[in-house]
Swiss-Prot record:
InterPro entries: DUF4198. Keywords: Signal. Residues 1-18 form the signal peptide. It comes from Haemophilus influenzae (strain ATCC 51907 / DSM 11121 / KW20 / Rd). The lineage of its organism: Bacteria, Pseudomonadati, Pseudomonadota, Gammaproteobacteria, Pasteurellales. It comes from the Bacteria. This is Uncharacterized protein HI_1427.
Length: 278
């Protein structure tokens, strides 16, 4: 019994590897509002408490105003909850989340937050970094489309090529992927939505997330996302490259998400299913 319990705990820590980062924030706010946003880390679209041991991985959330001004949000409430220091001035903002580069290595006993040198008989190592972004508009004016189509400068970034507030189900929505400031060609981009995930919650929360779209970027890093139904869409790209020093780690892996509301999402999420990992 004891042995099994230890094994399952190690498996759990490995499974946590499959968590991802996205930004949970309102799309619109009334003038004079304080922004409340959530640094989501887990299984989309369920926002949960970040495990204590992982808190150090995350940088504080940031917002970037359409005029280029950047502010760091304050962590207040649960460890994933952030808000602006004061009421935001009118205009459009990017809200960003960052999971700092972190080594994860695996051996027969599971995953550990370390590089190859820190584990006995390691089989795999990845230096993981994750980014998420979402748009919010404060006040009565529409989303600032020019700002929405401008890069923030994340190491791996999904950039809209059209006004996101005009995204419609059944119509292509073009985006461009940048990795270290260069268009990323030939990479797979996937997308799903809250309205898709609820159709198979067991898979969604069991690290087998059903996708509503998959496509590959062209030579300019562009791809047309085709959201077939209304919902809060999460567009995602993963890019892996060999780590500079193979004695330390094999892969450098970047993960990035963009939240794209298309029509209306779910008014309420069903409870997240309990998972029993054996």
């Amino acid at each position: 019994m004891k042995k099994t319990l230890i094994t399952s705990l190690l498996v759990l820590s490995g499974i946590a590897q499959a968590h991802e980062v996205w930004v949970q924030a309102p799309t619109k706010l009334a003038s004079g509002s304080v922004l409340k946003a959530e640094l989501a880390y887990g299984d989309y679209p369920y926002v949960e408490k970040i495990p204590e041991a992982r808190l150090k991985i995350f940088a504080p959330m940031e917002i970037i105003h359409q005029n280029g001004e950047k502010q760091t949000l304050i962590q207040k409430g649960e460890n994933y909850q952030y808000q602006s220091e004061k009421a935001l001035s009118d205009g459009s903002y990017w809200v960003t989340a960052t999971y700092k580069p972190t080594f994860w290595s695996q051996n027969a006993e599971g995953w550990k937050m370390d590089n190859l040198k820190g584990l006995e008989n390691p089989t795999y190592c990845e230096q993981t970094q994750m980014f998420g972004k979402s748009l919010v508009t404060v006040g009565k004016k529409p989303l600032n489309a020019e700002m929405a189509m401008t890069r923030v400068g994340l190491p791996l970034e999904i950039v809209p090529l059209r006004d996101p507030s005009k995204a419609k189900s059944g119509e292509p929505f073009p985006v461009q992927i940048f990795y270290q400031d260069q268009p990323l060609a030939g990479e797979t981009v996937i997308a799903t939505a809250d309205t898709i995930i609820v159709k198979d919650l067991e898979a969604s929360t069991g690290h087998r997330e059903p996708q509503g779209f998959s496509g590959k970027t062209d030579s300019q890093g562009r791809v047309n996302i085709i959201p077939l139904i209304d919902g809060i869409w999460k567009i995602k790209v993963i890019h892996k490259t060999p780590f500079a020093d193979q004695q330390i780690c094999q892969q450098s892996a970047s993960y990035s998400t963009l939240i794209l509301p298309v029509g209306k999402g779910l008014a309420k999420l069903p409870p997240k299913p309990e998972h029993h990992h054996h």
